[in-house]
Amino acid sequence: MEFKAFIEITRPHNCLLAGIVGVLGSIVAAGGLPELKTAILVFLVVFLGCAGGNTINDYFDYEIDKINRPERPLPRGAMSRKAALWYSVALFATGIVLAWFINIWDFLLAIVAYVTMFIYAWKLKPMPFIGNVVVASLTGATPLYGAIAVGEIGLAGTLALCAFLVNVAREVIKDIEDIEGDMAKGAKTLPILIGRKRAAYVGALFAILTVVASFLPIKAGIGLGYLAMLPVDAVILYSAFLILRSQDRETAHRAQILLKVSVFLAVVAFLIASLVR
């Protein structure tokens, strides 16, 4: 068993990004910096939830990762499945304890989110489109988690909607990327059921809906601060163009990575908008 596997299996860069998005959700909602204690707790609860979710996902995806992700800790033998299971439980438990010190609503939301992550990895992931929507909902809830911590919603509501829509697009495109391994496991993902091309249309549609939703703050009188979102919209539309042009594994990987980056860029754009309006 490799010690570094305990770090690697959590996908720390993803968890770091998620934690930052949670904190930025607080800032976007309040239009200013939250208390340091609140910011640290929000970051840790989101980070630990993401880490636990990635770990339990790898536990249940052991067989399919032998095909799609053979370099990951479990399929390459760097960590046992039993260790991964208990590690995920420890991560979730620590996050729930910390959430108690934020407020009751964030405590309850953390429990719901963590349980949803487990059920998703256990049962929902192979279900066509439903699994995609669940993951996107969890991602969309991340900035809302930070907003609830400061008792405000504000622009974080629109940010959460955009994060949800763009992540539906990303999850569908990821399924296009992983179609070979999913077929080998017998999963019934959207690309397997309706074909790569039609799935690409679905992914592109949600990407376009994200861009449309991103204009909502203008109606709230956000002013010139919205201009920061325009480059993000361009990245999202380019991702849609890529997947419509080609559905091969390499292109799908590139498109979904761009959409992943766009989530963080969108948070930064909304942050700028909330501070300069």
Swiss-Prot record:
Compartments in which it is found:
Cell membrane
Give the protein's cofactors. Answer: Mg(2+)
Q: Which InterPro entries match?
A: DGGGP_synth (IPR023547), Prenyltransferase_related (IPR050475), UbiA_prenyltransferase (IPR000537), UbiA_sf (IPR044878)
Bilayer-spanning residue ranges = 16-36, 40-60, 83-105, 107-124, 146-166, 202-222, 224-244, 256-276
The record lists the catalysed reaction(s) as: sn-3-O-(geranylgeranyl)glycerol 1-phosphate + (2E,6E,10E)-geranylgeranyl diphosphate = 2,3-bis-O-(geranylgeranyl)-sn-glycerol 1-phosphate + diphosphate
Record keywords, A-Z = Cell membrane, Lipid biosynthesis, Lipid metabolism, Magnesium, Membrane, Phospholipid biosynthesis, Phospholipid metabolism, Transferase, Transmembrane, Transmembrane helix
Major subcellular site: membrane
Record-level GO cellular component terms = plasma membrane
User: What pathway is this protein said to act in by its record?
Assistant: Membrane lipid metabolism; glycerophospholipid metabolism
> Which Pfam families does the entry link to?
UbiA
Membrane topology per the entry is: Multi-pass membrane protein
GO MF annotation: an example: geranylgeranylglycerol-phosphate geranylgeranyltransferase activity
Q: Name one GO biological process term.
A: glycerophospholipid biosynthetic process
EC no. given is 2.5.1.42
Which HAMAP family has this protein been placed in? Answer: DGGGP_synth
Per the entry, what this protein does is: Prenyltransferase that catalyzes the transfer of the geranylgeranyl moiety of geranylgeranyl diphosphate (GGPP) to the C2 hydroxyl of (S)-3-O-geranylgeranylglyceryl phosphate (GGGP). This reaction is the second ether-bond-formation step in the biosynthesis of archaeal membrane lipids.
Q: Which family does it belong to?
A: Belongs to the UbiA prenyltransferase family. DGGGP synthase subfamily.
Q: Give the protein name, as stated in the record.
A: Digeranylgeranylglyceryl phosphate synthase
Q: Which organism does this sequence originate in?
A: Thermococcus kodakarensis (strain ATCC BAA-918 / JCM 12380 / KOD1)
